[in-house]
Regions:
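Conserved short beta-strand elements that form part of the metal-binding/catalytic scaffold
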Residues: 28-62, 72, 107, 111-116
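Eukaryotic phosphotyrosine signaling hubs
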Residues: 5, 64-65
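Short amphipathic alpha-helices within nucleic acid-binding modules
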Residues: 21, 75-80
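Vicinal oxygen chelate
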Residues: 3-6, 10, 31-34, 78-120
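Core segments of cupin and vicinal oxygen chelate
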Residues: 2-5, 9-48, 83, 95
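Helix N-cap motif at beta-to-alpha junctions
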Residues: 14-15, 72-75
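Short beta-strand micro-motifs in enzyme catalytic cores
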Residues: 39-41, 65, 98-102
Length: 120
């Protein structure tokens, strides 16, 4: 399997301003969804890869977009990234009913999310 980008996510320091900006710029359909103790905003784009927005979980860091690549086994891919000189920023975490993700950095410091969809 190739590993396509399957999701993009904005971690914003001002989620209200970001929502107004992107909805006005692209006419995206935004939907706020309660997710544990936070609200996650899904981005509907029609065709193409959708995504989401959330409050930046790391205070003091700039707002940034992050892409997620599909993998067959997120635990194995995370371990492989580490063995190749990458670092694990967020270990494998379950998204109930949907799948699992981790966040890695490559040896240059660039972040990438890894996503494994739950099999039916």
């Amino acid at each position: 399997m190739g590993n396509p980008f399957v999701h993009v996510e904005l971690m914003s320091n001002d989620i209200g301003q970001a929502k107004t900006f992107y909805q006005s710029l692209f006419d995206w359909k935004l939907n706020d969804v309660p997710f544990g103790e936070m609200t996650y905003t899904t981005i509907g784009v029609g065709e193409g890869t959708g995504g989401g927005m959330m409050k930046n979980p790391v205070p003091g860091t700039p707002s940034a977009w992050m892409a997620y690549a599909a993998v067959d086994d997120v635990k194995a891919a995370t371990a492989k990234a580490k063995s190749l000189g990458g670092a694990v920023m967020k270990d494998v975490t379950e998204v109930p009913g949907m799948g699992w993700f981790s966040v890695i950095t490559d040896p240059t410091g660039a972040m990438l999310g890894l996503w494994e969809t739950k099999k039916a």
